[in-house]
Amino acid sequence: MAKSGVKFKDTMAAYDRLRGEIAGRKFAPVYLLMGEEAFFIDALCDLLASTILQESERAFNQLTVYGRDSDAGQVVNLCRQMPMMGSYQVVILKEAQQLRGLDKLSLYTSKPSPTTILIVCHKEKNADKRSAFYKGCAANGAVLESVRPRDYEIAAWLQQFIRQKGFTIDP
C-alpha cells in the first residue's frame, strides 16, 4: 500500500486551520475526516457537532448514523432533507470505512446541499483518493488526513497540547 506523503506536522497544521475556521463559524458543506489517528478525527467531529447548531436545534437537525448499520443511499437521502426550524442540518457519519457503497456518496459530495453539513469520520485507513467520493469532498468541502505521530514527535506535541489547555509539563 502506498504512503500518502502526509506527515504528522501536516495533520496538526490542518487540524489547527480547521479549528480556526470552525471557531469563526465558517463551515464547509462536507468534512471528510480520515486516517489512522483517531484523536484528531474524534476531536474535530465533536467540535463540529457542538458548534454548528445551538442546543435547542440539535434534537431536530443533527443526525448520527453508523457505517455498519447504514448504506450510502440512506445517507444521501438524509443529506437531501431540509433543516427543521434552523439554518443547517448536520449529518454525522461515523465508521464510514464500514459503509456499504461508500463511493456512492459521491452523488452527494459532488453537489452538496447548502443547508446540510455532512461530517464523514473514516478511521483506521484513508479513503481512496482516486474515488469520486474523495474528489467531491476535496473540491466541495474540507479534508483532514490524520496520520499517527512517530515516537519522536509525541513529546513535543503533548507539551504543545497541554500548554494550549493552560498547564505546563516538564520532560
Predicted regions mapped to residue ranges:
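Non-catalytic interfacial helical region
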Residues: 2-16, 24, 31, 39-171
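P-loop (Walker A) phosphate-binding loop of NTP-binding proteins
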Residues: 36
